């Protein structure tokens, strides 16, 4: 995987691109990566006691073995494409917080190869909008936790020397109610108040 990432970085650098992304590599799915980044991992996978990578693939493809028998997360079409993404599950006990280092490790890996990249992460609005809620809580109940997590993400990238961060918000193409717009604006007002000089691209 590292060899493939290095080859891709070199090709993009040699092509003269102004903005080269990082964190665009995934072993399975970008939404699943974001779920693990934000600690949105159902207990049925955590309780298997697997290695981090095996736990990731249990969520992606299910697990049948000596440690248990669980189905994978549900899949849905990514908007109007033939790509399918893994649907994050959020229940009333989910503690949404920054819990993984993948985006930061890949940014540092690119720096070690002489490339200062623009990290790319699925944005908070799209993540909450596409998640499946199991219980009584809705996306609004996770406002504080998810904004805190993205502020932490920004802070870590500032410390690492990043200049740009790209937050992908494809859910903005959908018809949005007044409440949706207000929720989106509230998310980004809080986050952008704490960007510490980092340039944010949507």
Feature roles, as predicted:
Residues 1-202:
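Domain-level signal for soluble alpha/beta catalytic cores
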């Amino acid at each position: 995987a590292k060899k493939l990432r290095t080859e891709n970085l070199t090709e993009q650098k040699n092509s003269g691109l102004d903005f080269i992304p990082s964190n665009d590599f995934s072993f399975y799915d970008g939404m699943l990566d974001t779920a693990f980044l934000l600690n949105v991992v159902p207990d049925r996978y955590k309780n298997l006691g697997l290695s981090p990578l095996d736990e990731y693939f249990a969520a992606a493809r299910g697990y049948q073995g000596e440690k248990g028998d669980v189905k994978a997360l549900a899949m849905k079409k990514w908007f109007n494409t033939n790509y399918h993404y893994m649907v994050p599950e959020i229940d009333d006990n989910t503690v949404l917080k920054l819990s993984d280092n993948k985006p930061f490790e890949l940014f540092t890996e690119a720096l070690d190869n002489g490339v200062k990249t623009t990290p790319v992460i699925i944005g908070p609005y799209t993540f909450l909008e596409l998640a499946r809620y199991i219980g009584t809580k809705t996306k609004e109940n996770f406002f504080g936790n998810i904004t805190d997590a993205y502020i932490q993400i920004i802070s870590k990238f500032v410390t690492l020397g990043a200049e740009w961060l790209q937050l992908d918000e494809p859910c903005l193409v959908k018809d949005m109610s007044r409440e949706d717009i207000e929720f989106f604006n509230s998310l980004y007002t809080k986050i952008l108040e704490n960007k510490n000089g980092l340039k944010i691209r949507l």
